[in-house]
Structure formats: C-alpha cells, structure tokens
C-alpha cells in the first residue's frame, strides 16, 4: 500500500518555476572580447587600488587648499576623481596631478582677445553725438573733461578715443580752411592736450615722398624754357637749350634768417623765460662782471651771518653746518690771494686829486730859497 503522506504529496499541483532574466550588458562589456584590453596604452587598476588612489588625491587637494586659504586667487582643484572618469582613462593610469584653474576673472585675460574683449572701430552711429557736439560748438571745438566724460558714456568710447576724434576733426577743418574759431578762444579745462595734438600735426615735418611729389608737380606745371639760338653766328642750324641755373640753397639756416616763432603757451615757464634767456645769450657777461657779482654776493652773505652771530652766538654755532665754516674760510683765503695778485691801479678821480695837490703845494727845494729873500726884503 502507498502511505497517505506520499499520496497527498503526489496530489499537490506543481507550481511553474520562473527564471529571472540576466541584466543587459553595457557597450564596453559587450566589446570587451572584441577590442584589445589595453587599447590606449594604459594599464588596468584593481577596483580597490583605484579607490585608494582616489582617496589619496582627494586628501592631497583638501590639504593644499587649506594651506592656501586666505590668499587672493586661490587655485581650485577638483576633489578626487569624478564618477564618470575611469582610472584607466587617466594619463599614466593614475589620478596624478590634475590641472588647476584660478577663480579670479581677471586671470582669464588673454593678449590676443580670447577673453571676449575685442577691439572695435568706431562706427558712424557711435560718432554721431560727437559730430552733433562739434556742430553746436563751432566757435570753440575744445570739449572740457566733463564734456568728454559725457560723450564717452554716450558713445561707448574711451576718453582717449574721444580726444583723438576731436583732434582729428580740428586738423581736418584746418586743412580744409574751415576754421571758425580763434586759437586763443579755448577753454582752460583740459584743452592743453588737444592743442598740443594740433600743434604736433601742424609742426610735423613732411615726408620725403611728399617733397618729391611737390618737386615733380613744379617741374610738370612750371613754365617750359624755349630753345634760343646762340648769339654768335657760327652754325645757324645747331641750337642749344639754355637752362637757368638754380641758386643753391644751403640746408643750414643762417643766424640772420628769421625763424618762425612758436606761440607761447599759457602757464608755461619755459616759454615765459625763453625771451629773457635769448636776450642774455646775445650779450654774455664778462669775467669782471662775474667776479663783481660773486664778491657782492659773498659780502652780503657775510654781513647776514655776522648779524645772526651777534643776535645769538650759541644758536648760530649749533645751527651752522661745519662744512659751511670750512667753505667760508676757503673763500676768505681765495679773496686775499686775489687781492694780492690784482694790480694796484688808482682810480681816475684819485689820480686827478693827487695831481692837483702836487701843483698847489710847493716843493721842499724851493721853500728854503724863498724864505731868505723874504727876510732880506
């Protein structure tokens, strides 16, 4: 007989077994058997070794950033290895030194304009406010500093660009003979630079090409010299061309030639003193005048020092520099030597007085002879 327990087990329905599907393989895993394992010339890390290296890199970056805390422009390093950056994809197979970048914006400047700041030329729309200002100030086209700042803000240009634009405009008007202002009618606030720019352009020497072009123009448009027959009646058929001889002009200017005088600038010490210097250069002082002025100056200084010494001798000794005493002693010795070497000449007034005294006073030889005669009489 079959036991009851076995019968019950046989009667129980069997449940169907469900199998779980395998996870889909990723692309690198799928290509692992096809591609070589060391494709980029790197070596593989064990997962545990990769984690240790990542922890070391993160700790080193944190320690370096902590030591540089408080300094401007602290370099920022990436903390560890990102999750999507596999260790085998790193250069050399490990984390290694990562490239650093700075947090300051001014350190991203590049001289070739890679930082987004590009130099651009001024357009007609940008210079329209400048033209309007120049049209409304024809009698005085010299903007002040406040006007330049206002125009620079309105046009998006710099102060240098605004000043250069106005200087070029004034030069262009001068060349076209459309100058409607007087050079003296200028504003005193920041207009000296503009006037200097104008003067530099006008006083700038012309280039060699322009001189050659002018000479060519003179030769082209000049009066042609016709051929004239020779006065001697030799051969009538042969005529010679007479060319006028040009006077050679020396490139070195003469002293008598009048050089164009430059307009003196306001508040210019050099221009104010230039006239005095030129007059002094015409008549150089002689050596006698120099000696006279030097002696007068020394005498005045000595008198002043004597007065100071009389007022307070102790203060004078303490405040006087020792080298000054030495200098005064040397000057006194030099004065004595000059006095001994100088020829002793009597002035004309003293000479005349001496001659008169000699004529008026009788000679000692004549006095004894005259006295006995008077007694005899």
UniProtKB/Swiss-Prot annotation:
GO biological process terms held by the UniProt record: cell development; negative regulation of transcription by RNA polymerase II; neuron differentiation; neuron remodeling; positive regulation of transcription by RNA polymerase II; regulation of transcription by RNA polymerase II
One function term, GO molecular function aspect: DNA-binding transcription factor activity, RNA polymerase II-specific
Subcellular location: Nucleus
Lineage: Eukaryota, Metazoa, Ecdysozoa, Nematoda, Chromadorea
Name recorded for this polypeptide: Putative iroquois-class homeodomain protein irx-1
Domain of life: Eukaryota
Family statement drawn from the similarity comment of this UniProt entry: Belongs to the TALE/IRO homeobox family.
Ranges of compositional bias, category Low complexity: 359-377
DNA-binding span(s): 120-177
Stated role: Transcription factor. Required for D-type inhibitory GABAergic motor neuron synaptic remodeling, acting via degenerin unc-8-dependent and -independent mechanisms. Regulates expression of genes involved in synaptic remodeling, including negative modulation of immunoglobulin domain-containing protein oig-1 and positive modulation of unc-8.
């Amino acid at each position: 007989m079959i036991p009851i327990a076995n019968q019950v087990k046989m009667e129980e329905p069997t449940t169907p077994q469900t199998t779980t599907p395998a996870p889909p393989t990723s692309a690198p895993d799928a290509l692992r058997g096809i591609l070589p394992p060391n494709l980029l010339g790197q070596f593989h890390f064990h997962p545990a070794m990769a984690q240790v290296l990542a922890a070391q890199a993160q700790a080193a970056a944190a320690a370096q950033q902590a030591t540089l805390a408080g300094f401007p422009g602290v370099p920022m390093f990436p903390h560890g290895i990102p999750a999507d950056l596999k260790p085998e994809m790193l250069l050399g197979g490990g984390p290694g030194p990562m490239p650093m970048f700075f947090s300051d914006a001014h350190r991203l400047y590049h001289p070739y304009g890679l930082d987004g700041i590009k130099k651009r030329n001024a357009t007609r729309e940008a210079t329209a406010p400048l033209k309007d200002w120049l049209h409304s100030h024809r009698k005085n086209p010299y903007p002040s500093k406040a006007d330049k700042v206002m125009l620079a803000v309105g046009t998006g240009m710099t102060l240098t660009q605004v000043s250069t634009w106005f200087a070029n405009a004034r030069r262009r008007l001068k060349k076209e003979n459309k100058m409607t202002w007087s050079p003296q009618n200028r504003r005193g606030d920041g207009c000296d630079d503009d006037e200097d720019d104008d003067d530099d352009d006008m006083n700038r020497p012309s280039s060699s090409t322009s001189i050659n072009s002018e000479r060519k123009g003179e030769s082209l448009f000049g009066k042609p010299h016709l051929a004239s027959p020779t006065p001697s009646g030799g051969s009538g058929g042969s005529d010679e061309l007479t060319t006028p001889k040009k006077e050679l002009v020396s490139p070195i200017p003469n002293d008598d030639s009048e050089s164009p005088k430059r307009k003196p600038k306001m508040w210019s010490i050099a221009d104010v003193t230039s006239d005095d210097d030129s007059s002094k250069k015409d008549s150089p002082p002689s050596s006698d005048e120099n000696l006279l002025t030097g002696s007068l100056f020394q005498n005045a200084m000595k008198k002043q020092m004597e007065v100071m010494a009389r007022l307070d001798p102790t203060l004078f000794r303490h405040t006087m520099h020792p080298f000054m005493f030495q200098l005064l002693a040397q000057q006194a010795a030099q004065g004595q030597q000059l006095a001994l070497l100088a020829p002793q000449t009597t002035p004309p007034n003293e000479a005349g007085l001496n001659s008169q005294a000699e004529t008026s006073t009788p000679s000692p030889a004549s006095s004894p002879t005259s006295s006995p005669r008077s007694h005899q009489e």
